[in-house]
């Protein structure tokens, strides 16, 4: 989806909805609906709905890619300390649907749906660190498991809600 051209379904001051009809082999019958919303000044919501109109199941492993400003390298992820200088190659961490992250005094709650693995990384090319909720991390490098599929004529929703605490 990153290199694809998405169609705008709707747009207003605080919401945008995008649509992609796949042309990739094996995904010809798949529609991707991506919705972003800013419900208030402290929240951002992203939802991806994968609609499989074909007969065969399709493999998916999506993720959202939020970058957070972080001048320093130290951050906290669910109470565990991390140093961004040591995660340049990505660390995959399982997390419950409610996650707590803190960077340089910025405190966030991230609530997810069907995204139980976080990719934690920073290439230190800028003053940011990434805490990216994913369906199964780098799962496409391994044989498929059942949770990675959207059944024929089925839908699956993935969601992320970021709430600023301080």
Please annotate each region the language model reported.
Residues 34-36, 44-52:
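Short, well-ordered beta-strand segments enriched in hydrophobic/aromatic residues
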